[in-house]
Swiss-Prot record:
Span(s) of short sequence motif 'HIGH' region: 31-41
Subunit architecture: Monomer.
Protein name from the UniProt record: Cysteine--tRNA ligase
Organism: Thermus thermophilus (strain ATCC BAA-163 / DSM 7039 / HB27)
PANTHER family: CYSTEINE--TRNA LIGASE, CYTOPLASMIC (PTHR10890:SF3), CYSTEINYL-TRNA SYNTHETASE (PTHR10890)
GO biological process, one term: cysteinyl-tRNA aminoacylation
EC number: 6.1.1.16
UniProt keyword terms in alphabetical order: Aminoacyl-tRNA synthetase, ATP-binding, Cytoplasm, Ligase, Metal-binding, Nucleotide-binding, Protein biosynthesis, Zinc
Positions annotated to bind ATP: K279
A Gene Ontology term for the protein's cellular component: cytosol
Entries under Gene3D superfamilies matching the protein: Cysteine-tRNA ligase, C-terminal anti-codon recognition domain, HUPs
Amino acid sequence: MGLVIYDTLARRKVPFEPAVPGHVGIYVCGPTVYSDPHLGHARGPVVYDILRRYFLHKGYKVRFVSNITDVGHLTDDADEGEDKIVRRAKLERLEPMEVADKYMWSYFDAMQALNVLRPSIAPRASGHIPEMLELTERLLARGHAYERKGSVYFRVRSFPEYGKLSGKRLEELRAGARVEVREEKEDPLDFALWKAAEPGHIMRWKSPWGEGYPGWHIECTAMSLKYLGEGFDLHAGGIDLQFPHHECEIAQAEAAGFRFARHWMHHNHVLLEGEKMAKSTGNLVLLHDLLEAHEPMALRFYLLQTHYRSPMDFTWEGLESAKRGYGRLLHAYREVRGRKKTAPPGTTPELERALDALEKAFMEAIEDDLSTPEALAALFAFLPELHKLLPEAKAESLARAEAVFHTLGEGILGLFPERVLEERVSGPLLEGLIALLLELREEARRAKDYEKSDLIRERLRALGVIVEDTKEGPRWRLER
């Protein structure tokens, strides 16, 4: 049937049809890099990674742009407060760009661990000041902006469609709710395109209105248009960005005379103890702590168990349950790979039919607004039939089962990178198994069964374990 998405702008599910056949342009609002990422920062990247993987599976060429905000995002998300990165730089006694680099790489490392594909382009806001200045000047020339005391503000009431994404009406927006009243503003609803730098402000650039720095909203408008062009296919981000950030992006672009994003998608919050996970409140679980203690793919699986438009309530019990569920799928995939090597030639009709049903149910789920819970349910519904048929399954059908697991489970869901499919023994388990084999070898030596003793030693050597007999007893080391 093709992909159907819930379009926030249309307020309904709509068929997704790219502007240029065979090509898809996606812009996702990326992180403001002033601290380590928490679990809430992983949900959007994982969700839109599924979308990207789906398009790649379908043969599309995908340009996936996700920015890095390293300037201009103030502490209250509006036009007041301190730049978040500058504030952090003061706390850590670093230069702002040192802070941005440090936490940008922290974010990228976490995304790599979660098997999220790197963006085609990851533009940094600080590298696109000329584009922002050009857009600001264009808005001034068209009467949609005005300058006051070195700052430039967007004249919200000059754009009658302001509010069409969020459903908010100008008359209903109260001064002081999400915007602060400043004396130089014509209207309290107006927002900054360019901010005059106060004395001592570290991050500043020259502009026609004096030294300053960009407003948060203009950054994504300028960068998305630069890399994806007018009328690009999809803009996505968290539900908390819908207003004011995305609303302001639309106003800036369209008031400047540009066609902006054709479709909009928004993912919901990750909750902890019933409250939104957020840096500002400290109500969070850091991603790196989770990734160190748990299999990253089990964490990705956990994120996919809830539909992206629904709030996800994080619990430790839920994570443990997800680890068990992921383990069941991983075990089944490994079983298929292992049995394929020794299975007799031919096909197994019952398995072929089960695979047909799986592929149909899975793709229907994904194409219905990325219903990952239903896609996972299709995989689990397939497991009983698979386990029943595995003992007698033929090689060609097992090869197809492996390919289906790879296409659906890794190609689209991103759950089975090669490293998790390689069953490796390490740590205490490895040491225990070697100790057991050496004990059996010592028993054989005491019984003067040197043939068995030598056989154990040679088999261990073939596996890369070197055994050395000493006065204190046998020692072993891994061959380098």
